[in-house]
Each structure stands twice: as structure tokens, then as C-alpha cells.
Amino acid sequence: MSSEDTTSQRAPRNWWGPFAPIGEALRFLTILPVPGLPPMSEEAIPQSIRYFPIAGLVIGGILAAVGWGAGVLWNETVRAVVLVVAWGVLTAGMHLDGLSDTFDGVMSWRSRERKLEIMRDSRIGVMGALALAAVLGLKAAFLAGAGDAWLTAVVLAPVLGRWADVYGIVRFPPAREGGLGRTFQSYLRPGDFAGASVATLALALIVGGVGGLIALALVWMVTHLLGRWWTRDLGGLTGDTYGALCEIAEVVALATLTLSAPMRLLAT
């Protein structure tokens, strides 16, 4: 047997076929085991960008199941806390880490170079801790008081959060030459943003009705304003700021989708 035959036999089998980018998005954005994918390559993750909202839908579906189970056992407040914890665990806290690093840097009021250095530091400062407390507390509070709207909110918010990442990657320049943003932009293909946006628009309408479309519009507005601020402040966006965009977008989505009477009427 030749060495080429041996290598061929040992090569992992790609079960996903043309849907491999969806698997790559899940592998990158969650802790879910994703068997049957080839070894991760530099271009694999950027080429999965148009499927980030689909990965968000998977996250939302899992959270819906967790929330249903928690609701059977406990009251709405406990269910909300369980959901927020499960949310962080399911995504390995990746976006939360970016949130804390971003606010430690941009709220330090130092030079651009010093802010980027602070964001590289793995230690959490006061501003990062405050940002984490605010985001986690708001998520739990919105879900605890959502009534029946919690289900729509928890399914759709991760979709809108991942779309915010796609918008940030496509719309704003990377702050570092060798950073994650540069890697993403190097492999962007025509139609990536359009594909992600069409999927997000459809999911927002199907899951949330008119309320979902309003949530998407508000997420876009906040994401754009934050992207402009951080681009002016840092010279572009980084992997940390993408995480922050996702977390803040999720809070905006939850705030909109859990408005008591108006959003429930619009969703019907």
C-alpha cells in the first residue's frame, strides 16, 4: 500500500458535503460537537460567515428547549437565570470575553495603541466587569419579565446577534493587520452579506412577525453606531469588538422582543 493510499484512508470523512460551511459556523460559534468536518483551515471560518445567522437559530432552538425544561421545574426568574447561564456555556463565553475586553480598552481613555494593548490583556478590568454585569443582568431581567414572549425572544436574539457580527465584519475595516477581522475580510465572497441578511430577515419575520423586523432594524442601528464609534476610536474593529457587537445586539433584541403588549400584538 502506498503512502498516498494510507493518507487517503486516514483523511477525515466530510459528511456535510455542500453544507460544510454551516458545520464550520457551528464549530466556530458554539461548543457543540460537529463530527464529519475536515480539519479547520484559515479560510474555512470566514467562508462560513453567511451561515452565522443559521448557527444563531440553532443556538436559539437549544435555548428554547432548555428554557422549556427550566420552566417546568421552576418559576420565570429561575428560568431566566438558567437561560443566561446556558447561553454563555453554549457559546463558550466567547462573545462575553470580547465584550469585557472591548470595554476595558475603549473606556480606558488612553491612546489608540494603548487601548488595543489593553484589549489583548486576558485580565478583566473594572469597565469590563461592569459591561459583563450589565449585559448578563439585562438579559436575565428581560427574560424574567417577558411572559410568553420569552420563547420568541430567546430563539430570535441569537440570530440577530450573529447577523450583527456579519454586519460589523463587512461594513467596518479591521483594526489590526494580523487580526481576526483581516482574516475574515481576506476571504469574503460576493453575496456573503446578502445571504446572511436575507436569512436573518426571513427568520425575523417568521419567528417574530413585525416585532421581529423592528428588532432587526434597532439591532442594525445600534450595531452601526457602535461600529462607527469603535472604528473612530480604534482604527477599525477586532475580534473582541465583534463579540461585543453580538452581545449588545442580543440585549437590544431581547429588550425589543419582550416589550409586553405591543410586541406580542405585532408578532401575531
From Swiss-Prot:
Its EC number is 2.7.8.26. GO terms for molecular function: adenosylcobinamide-GDP ribazoletransferase activity; cobalamin 5'-phosphate synthase activity. It is an enzyme of class 2 (transferase). Pathway: Cofactor biosynthesis; adenosylcobalamin biosynthesis; adenosylcobalamin from cob(II)yrinate a,c-diamide: step 7/7. InterPro entries: CobS (IPR003805). It catalyses: alpha-ribazole + adenosylcob(III)inamide-GDP = adenosylcob(III)alamin + GMP + H(+); alpha-ribazole 5'-phosphate + adenosylcob(III)inamide-GDP = adenosylcob(III)alamin 5'-phosphate + GMP + H(+). GO terms for cellular component: plasma membrane. Its cofactor is Mg(2+). Keywords: Cell membrane, Cobalamin biosynthesis, Magnesium, Membrane, Transferase, Transmembrane, Transmembrane helix. It is a multi-pass membrane protein. One of its GO terms (biological process) is cobalamin biosynthetic process. The chain crosses the membrane at residues 54-74, 80-100, 124-144, 150-170, 202-222, 243-263. It is found in: Cell membrane. Its main location: membrane. Joins adenosylcobinamide-GDP and alpha-ribazole to generate adenosylcobalamin (Ado-cobalamin). Also synthesizes adenosylcobalamin 5'-phosphate from adenosylcobinamide-GDP and alpha-ribazole 5'-phosphate. Belongs to the CobS family. PANTHER family: ADENOSYLCOBINAMIDE-GDP RIBAZOLETRANSFERASE (PTHR34148:SF1). HAMAP family: CobS. This is Adenosylcobinamide-GDP ribazoletransferase.
